[in-house]
Amino acid sequence: MLRYAIIFFIIAIIAAVFGFGGIAAGAAEIAKILFYIFVVIFLVTLLLGVVRR
């Protein structure tokens, strides 16, 4: 149990460094772009699945 607490503490420290730095804004923009790309890919594969039936 102590091992998990230490692991999550280290993850929280790393997230705080990224969150309080300027990296968070850049990562959010990249995440938005990736979100829209994957939505388009999902819709294309959905349409291809419907057309093949």
From Swiss-Prot:
The UniProt record lists the keyword Membrane: yes
Keywords: Cell membrane, Membrane, Transmembrane, Transmembrane helix
Heme is among the record's keywords: no
InterPro entries listed in its UniProt record: DUF1328
Pfam families, per the entry: DUF1328
Protein location: Cell membrane
Family: Belongs to the UPF0391 family.
Protein name in the entry: UPF0391 membrane protein Bcen2424_6479
Taxonomic source organism: Burkholderia cenocepacia (strain HI2424)
